[in-house]
Amino acid sequence: MYGIEYTTVLTFLISLILLNYILKSLTRMMDFIIYRFLFIVVILSPLLKAQNYGINLPITGSMDTAYANSTQEETFLTSTLCLYYPTEAATEINDNSWKDTLSQLFLTKGWPTGSVYFKEYTDIASFSVDPQLYCDYNVVLMKYDATLQLDMSELADLILNEWLCNPMDITLYYYQQTDEANKWISMGSSCTIKVCPLNTQTLGIGCLTTDTATFEEVATAEKLVITDVVDGVNHKLDVTTATCTIRNCKKLGPRENVAVIQVGGSDVLDITADPTTAPQTERMMRINWKKWWQVFYTVVDYVNQIIQAMSKRSRSLNSAAFYYRI
């Protein structure tokens, strides 16, 4: 009788131990499955775009405007914007808190405080030497000046494109441009450029290599010059080296994260006629300009439309950078 009771108790204990082992095994198996599933989700989530079935609200949190359901890439939430302006803008506004005001206005367009940087430059000449286009998106405001029309046009060509440049020693060497993308870029306080094309015997064509007065003058007292001559022909150059430097440059393609906005002026500067601008796309906007506050209000109002036409830190050769005018 006691043997049967001991057997029953022993059987119960063995069953309890076996059940405990089975439960632990199931727990370990479920943990493995769950962790493996979560690992796969984490790996694949950056590669997938899911449909958003919620309501997208403006960053200000306003409930006044609801946008259609969609999966959107909110560029401004992870990007920086640099706004370059001439010194005269800050002088005219004459308000120590004007940048803070604009930052709050950019916030209403979805650009968080701290993502927009305001960079001042003295004049076109100093800006062209060292543009410092450091942000993901760069918008340059250029006040139209009839006396600097050529410099403005060439500055736009300079900063809207990527260039690879090397120094030139015009005292020792002749130079030729190999193709349409090859230009000579000169910068300085006053650049006067003269050229003398040479034949195969290195004799001047319509000029004397020993007399710079017979050279053909292609630029006079400009601050920025992009010189284009006949390809495949050697040239002897004369440059005002005391006030100007010249470089042999190759246009690599559009700098798609830069926009130039012309402020005011009756003439529209156009750089798309250059055969090296491919595709020849011109995008412009214009408002009646009176004061710098009006200019900045317009930029804030249209900033997202401008950004949509640009590419973030891109050097793609497939689409052109653009030139805006207000």
Curated annotation (Swiss-Prot):
Residues 1-50 form the signal peptide. It is found in: Virion; Host endoplasmic reticulum lumen. Ca(2+) 2 binds at Q177, D228, V229, D231, D301. N-glycosylated. The N-terminus is blocked possibly by pyroglutamic acid. Residues 165-167 are annotated as: CNP motif. Residues 237-239 are annotated as: LVD motif. Homotrimer; disulfide-linked. 2 Ca(2+) ions bound at each subunit interface in the trimer hold the trimer together. Interacts with the intermediate capsid protein VP6. Interacts with the outer capsid protein VP5*. Interacts with host integrin heterodimer ITGAV/ITGB3. This is Outer capsid glycoprotein VP7.
